[in-house]
């Protein structure tokens, strides 16, 4: 069940398996997302730094630079705060922890249902937008939603 959206949201989809990338991209576009694609880690880092996205869906196993390194470099070197969902077949606890340690906001294990990906995207985007509406100066917190 898709949530109605008032405006399009942009997503960078980083997946080296073309068939899966096309399936996920088509689904997201049908639910009012604007999707950019990257099939490798270097392209993902370039797009993640030069463009502004509402979220990034990032596969861990990529040619060249892996997804964990991409995530860590976007967070540490480029200070990118865009929500990142790791997308991978790795389902061991250690793998998940490495994803979160690299800076991921969520972790989705393949195979997955498209509505679950959409729900997770909606959630990380909603949380990131909520955080942008809160400001703190000298211990005084201001929430623009309550004004």
PLM regions: where:
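Short, Lys/Arg-enriched segments at the junction into DNA-binding effector domains
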Residues: 9-10, 122-147
């Amino acid at each position: 069940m898709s949530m109605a959206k008032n405006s399009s949201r942009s997503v960078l989809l980083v997946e080296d398996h073309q068939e899966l990338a096309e399936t996920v991209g088509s689904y997201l576009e049908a639910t009012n997302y604007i999707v950019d694609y990257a099939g490798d880690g270097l392209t993902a880092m370039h797009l993640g730094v030069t463009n502004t996205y509402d979220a990034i869906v990032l596969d861990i196993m990529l040619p060249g630079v892996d997804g964990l390194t991409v995530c860590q470099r976007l967070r540490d070197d480029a200070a990118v705060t865009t929500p990142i969902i790791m997308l991978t077949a790795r389902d061991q606890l250690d793998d998940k922890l490495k994803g979160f340690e690299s800076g991921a906001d969520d972790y989705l294990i393949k195979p997955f249902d498209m509505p679950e990906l959409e729900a997770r995207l909606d959630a990380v985007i909603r949380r990131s937008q909520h955080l942008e509406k809160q400001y703190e100066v000298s211990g005084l917190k201001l929430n623009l939603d309550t004004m």
